[in-house]
A protein has these predicted regions:
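Core nucleotide-handling region used for phosphoryl-transfer chemistry
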Residues: 1-281
Length: 281
């Protein structure tokens, strides 16, 4: 049982919002609610808050319908937990620069969510919904894709396309399968086979021995590929950390929330990279 399910045994979804800053997004017709922490209002290390990252529960039963990643942090952000990471057995994957997408089965059909919505809204400046865009990335509608999937699993993906660009450009709509969760056991499960059977991409896998090797790699990538976002490392206990490229962070700060902030231009100008900046925006 998740901590949020235990919480809801004695409290309500309204309490989640008022006490922990958890945003609730209800489906317009089905008994589903998306739970997401608030970057500012939610206590970031609270166990309930950590679980509420695109999590979907059945409103009536509180059963898990969609299980995504728990919240995880940038390396160095929560120093008390850095020592828990097991560098004797860990994997590293590229961090793709798109939008979280969650593919799941409910009430007899396959569906797809973004982290904060049921993907039924029209994408900004486009004539199609988020779900329709995801189907373009998958190359088929969700029901056809679902033939190769297990209805007891949530498929955690990164949807990348020209329509939801953050910093890195993706010329075509693509779907990266990041991992999968069994919604009964809540355990993470292998997903390479599902990627092969659906045509979804997988992040690039790297082999490193320690954090220093990762940081050197990212410094090299920053020079070769400035929009490369970074990597996610995961140990055998399921602990995850993200480590981002310094140039990606600079470009992301420069872009801001779709508004350019002049103060973030200075490091690029001092480095003589002002011409290169123009190619990213």
């Amino acid at each position: 049982m998740l901590a949020v399910q235990e919480y809801l045994q004695t409290k309500s979804f309204s309490d989640l919002e008022s006490e922990l800053g958890i945003k609730t997004t209800y489906h317009e017709s089905d008994p589903l609610v998306i739970l997401n922490y608030n970057q500012i209002e939610s206590p970031k290390l609270h166990p309930v808050v950590r679980e509420c990252r695109g999590l979907v529960l059945n409103v009536n039963t509180h059963d898990v319908v969609v299980k995504s990643f728990n919240r995880f942090f940038n390396w160095g952000e929560v120093q008390d937990e850095m020592g828990d990471f097991d560098f004797t057995d860990f994997t590293v994957q590229s961090k793709e620069d798109g939008s979280l997408a969650l593919i799941y089965h409910f009430d007899g059909k396959w569906r797809a969510n973004t982290r904060g919505s049921f993907a039924l809204d029209v994408m900004q400046f486009q004539g199609f919904t988020w779900q329709e865009a995801m189907c373009q990335a998958l190359g088929a509608d969700l029901q056809k894709v679902g033939v190769a999937l297990n209805p007891q699993h949530t498929y955690v993906c990164e949807f990348c396309s020209p329509w939801n660009k953050v910093v890195r450009r993706y010329p075509n709509a693509v779907m990266y399968l990041l991992t999968a969760f069994d919604r009964q056991t809540l355990e993470e499960i292998p997903c390479d086979g599902y990627a092969r059977s659906t045509g979804m991409l997988r992040p690039t896998v790297y082999e490193f021995k320690n954090i220093e090797e990762i940081q050197r790699f990212l410094q090299e990538q920053a020079e070769k590929d400035p929009t490369f976002e970074g990597v996610v490392m995961r140990d055998r206990h399921g602990h995850r950390w993200k480590i981002k490229s310094p140039t990606y962070l600079g470009l992301h700060r420069l872009k801001g929330n779709d508004t350019f902030n002049p103060k973030h231009l200075l490091p690029f100008i001092l480095a003589g990279e002002e011409d290169e900046l123009l190619t990213y925006f």
